[in-house]
Amino acid sequence: MKIAVKNNDNGHLVFDLCQMAAIKRPESIWIPDTYTIVDIKAAFVLIMEKESVLVDMVQQGFLQRYPNSILITAKGYADLNTKYLIREMFRYLPHIPYLYIGDYDPHGIDIFMNYCYGSKMTIYENCDLPFIEFIGVDARDMSLPYSALTPEDINKCQQVLDSPVIYAQSSISASSSFGRLQDMKRQHVIDMIRHMMANNFKCDIESLSVNSKLIPYIDSQLSLIDCRPIN
């Protein structure tokens, strides 16, 4: 698990590492198994599917444009430590956006759902993060580089559609605003998967980075929730 930390007065995260001194570092760092958050400031948290994309964003100056942000990646499917960290951050900062960005393919979407609702293997771990919102990549947003689905992708699409978490009954009342948001989130996932299968294409987020479209794309998505760069 890695986290990109911006060390300034606006967005940073400090850990007390048991017997070690607290740390503040401006680059990506490994988060240990045992820690205590002693200070955290951020306007939003952006969760990346891929480490390579996080590294590209840092190198392209994302943290200079958004010094009040925190970037996290579990390098694919989230391990429990990553999910516990995000849950702990939410305990300190429950009113900021927690956002996910990954591939527009069945694996990227399944990873998002795993963050939000876990899986059959983690049902008793109390680590679901239903407050995380999907901001991309959604190939319906713009003209993106794409490739055809493989037979394995098509099988994965069907697995996602058949997943219990898609149709699971929320413990939150469907009549509540939060319950309705969860229903909308699940429907959004269903719509994306069906769109993917109907059009037989997927989009790798790294293709945006190669074409220098990644930061502008994220800028456009963040602007929808009124998160804007400083330059």
Model region roles, listed by residue range:
Residues 1-99, 106-231:
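Nucleic-acid enzyme cleavage-core boundary/entry regions
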